[in-house]
Design a protein with these regions (language model features):
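Conserved active-site/ligand-binding neighborhood in enzyme cores
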Residues: 1-351
Length: 351
């Protein structure tokens, strides 16, 4: 299992948006695929890109782009990293344990759980009741939205108060104005939002966020070159204003046991466009909309076809594949516009 990690600089800015223009926490797998496809068109001839897509579309799966937290010890130069995955959309609660209002609010804020916590969730699935018999309050909560096991932060000389104060990003609103091309008059005043990376110094540790995604399958040199080019080209919107640069790229290998074992149920780590025969496997899910205009160096910016996808963290009663969908506008013939709705799944429950 190949993992690509990106280390943005302190104060790096990002604009990850949805179809309504609102900020998102992450880049979903379909958006990541589109960004890589656009970078491939910049690097290679469109016919070569079609060839690469045909060769790899059924062999390689991409997860969405997720966050990690890096703890760098400034005294000894050692670093420790924690990787986070989306919280499953199925209920997560301890059996026969009442929850008060304060604890409910704390648990509700958790959006991401660490790899170690996900391993615990895999064994906590209750087949008959269809929920996770697990207490999220047993985990260490970082910055309110992230949760990990005590073992994953063992050895760090930080207390619970320090963990709660961890902040990876801040959202900035910048005033903007639309200037008419005809008479240079200001027409509309608005605010543009963006996320800004924050490095924090706590005790001996420099705490910083990084981003990563997982690839399942064999990558050739062309795809690796495209991914590295995308880090320089940038991801998300407002790149002409300096947004989206991912910084240093690091590749590493992960063992397959967490992802390729058999399970009773599956949780998605990607956005998914299921086939008609796969809809019956839906258990817990949320829908997200994809629309907007195409981004291409060829031709005009036309509105692409609107689709709805299953959100990361959706739970399925069986393994599904998803599909790649052609969303090209009818009037755009320079090259195809694809949406990657392939399913990247992680099993839960014992077989």
């Amino acid at each position: 299992m190949k993992v690509f990690k990106f280390y943005p600089d302190n104060r790096a800015k990002f604009h990850f948006g949805d179809s309504s223009g609102k900020l998102k926490d992450i880049i979903s797998s379909d958006q990541l695929f589109s960004a890589l496809y656009n970078c491939a068109v910049l690097l290679y001839d469109p016919k070569e890109v079609e060839k690469i897509l045909a060769e790899t579309s059924h062999k390689i799966l991409f997860s969405s782009l997720y966050y990690g937290i890096r703890f760098f010890n400034c005294d000894n130069g050692q670093s420790q990293e924690i990787f986070f995955l989306p919280r499953p959309l199925a209920p997560i609660q301890p059996k026969d344990k009442p929850t008060n209002l304060l604890n409910h609010k704390i648990v509700k804020k958790i959006k991401y759980v660490s790899l170690g916590a996900f391993r615990l969730l895999q064994g906590a699935w209750q087949d008959e009741e269809k929920y996770f018999n697990f207490d999220l309050l047993d985990l260490k909560i970082l910055g309110g939205n992230f949760a990990c096991t005590a073992e994953e932060v063992e050895g760090l000389e930080l207390d619970n108060d320090s963990f709660e104060k961890i902040k990876l990003f801040t959202v900035n609103s910048t005033p903007r104005v639309v200037v008419s091309r005809l008479n240079d008059e200001a027409e509309n005043f608005y605010y543009q939002e963006g996320m800004e990376v924050i490095y924090q110094q706590m005790g001996n540790y420099l705490i910083s966020p990084f981003m990563y995604f997982i690839c399942q399958g064999d990558l050739d040199r062309r795809l690796t070159a495209i991914i590295r080019f995308a880090a320089d080209e940038g991801l998300g919107g407002k790149r002409s204003q300096g947004f989206g640069f991912l910084g240093r790229v690091v590749e590493e290998e992960w063992p397959d046991d967490l992802f390729l074992t058999k399970g009773q149920y599956y949780v998605s780590l990607s956005s998914i466009f299921p086939g008609l025969e796969e809809v019956n496997n839906l258990l817990y899910y949320e829908l997200v909309e994809r629309s907007g205009y195409i981004y291409s160096k060829y031709g005009r910016s036309l509105r692409k076809k609107q689709v709805r996808l299953l959100k990361e963290g959706s739970v399925f009663s069986g393994k599904i594949s998803g599909q790649i969908v052609d969303i090209s506008p009818e009037a755009f013939n320079e090259h195809k516009i694809y949406l990657n709705g392939k399913a990247f799944l992680i099993p839960v429950g014992e077989v």
